[in-house]
């Protein structure tokens, strides 16, 4: 599930949640929900923003491919 991938990649890159929020322009609250799995089905725009900031493809993060 992508919740673990977001946190895993973010921490591997030494990014805080606050930093990822700032560079992706996705709120900390929203990112927290994604990482915890309490928010599902993010929009393609959100997935693209997060993926770009983590330097991964959307499919690598959200579809585990």
Model region roles, listed by residue range:
Residues 15-33:
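Short alpha-helical DNA-recognition segment
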Residues 11, 25, 36-38:
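Residue-level detection of the helix-turn-helix DNA-binding "recognition helix"
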Residues 7, 18, 48:
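Residues within the helices of the helix-turn-helix
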Residues 45-60:
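DNA major-groove recognition helix of helix-turn-helix/homeodomain DNA-binding modules
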Residues 10, 21, 51:
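The alpha-helix within a helix-turn-helix
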